[in-house]
């Protein structure tokens, strides 16, 4: 068994624990390991942590973290700088009165202006803030119904693997790099993590 550092798009580092990784496919910043590559890890807790660490390549990516701010302003860019122009969370995360998110963000990306879009464009609730948190802290938060929108783990699997706003991260439009892998691969990692016991990396 060995631990390998994996660089995330956000600049953070996590430790991937695995067996026989020399036979695994080469990894780049834009790929995710398949669930089957973790099947040699016999201990459920160790496998769950390894799976969530891999899913963390998506979770800690700026495409995701920027919409999970700890304050009232969304973030932008790979460096996570405050949104320009100045906008605030507002009621329900949809922006202030007279300056709703959909004032500028349409139902789809507007590539000429590099403006991202989705029919339900909005911020995650502040209880779901990820900015400045470790992957382990986010993991515990994702499991906590008081901080995940009241979702069960099965609903989390569905949300991560099928929600179209989550899926925007793989289709972010001009000027933005997508999150690694595919939403199907990401959803499979989250499902396998839950099935292995949903243990979290250390904070």
Language-model regions, residue ranges each:
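Short C-terminal domain-edge/linker segments immediately following a structured domain
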Residues: 88, 97-98, 133
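Residue-identity detector for glutamine
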Residues: 27, 76, 84, 141, ...
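C-type cytochrome heme-c attachment and multiheme electron-transfer modules
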Residues: 46, 53, 62, 109, ...
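Detector for methionine-enriched segments
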Residues: 1, 13-16, 91, 99, ...
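Short, solvent-exposed loop/turn and secondary-structure capping segments
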Residues: 68-70, 76-80, 112-117
């Amino acid at each position: 068994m060995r631990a390998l550092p994996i660089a995330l798009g956000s600049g953070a580092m996590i430790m991937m624990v695995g067996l026989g990784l020399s036979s695994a496919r080469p990894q780049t910043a834009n790929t995710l390991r398949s669930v089957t590559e973790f099947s040699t890890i016999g201990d459920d807790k160790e496998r769950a942590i390894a799976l969530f660490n891999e899913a963390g390549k998506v979770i800690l990516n700026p495409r995701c973290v920027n919409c999970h701010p700890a304050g009232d302003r969304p973030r932008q860019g790979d460096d996570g700088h405050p949104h320009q122009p100045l906008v605030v969370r507002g009621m329900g995360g949809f922006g202030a009165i007279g300056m709703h998110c959909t004032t500028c963000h349409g139902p789809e990306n507007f590539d000429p202006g590099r403006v991202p879009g989705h029919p339900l464009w909005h911020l995650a609730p502040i209880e779901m803030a990820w900015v400045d948190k470790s992957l382990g802290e986010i993991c515990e938060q994702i499991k906590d119904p008081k901080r995940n929108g009241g979702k069960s783990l099965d609903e989390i699997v569905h949300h991560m693997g099928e929600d179209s706003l989550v899926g925007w991260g793989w289709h972010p439009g001009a000027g933005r790099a997508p999150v690694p892998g595919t939403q199907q691969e990401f959803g499979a990692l989250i499902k396998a993590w839950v099935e292995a016991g949903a243990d979290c990396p250390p904070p």
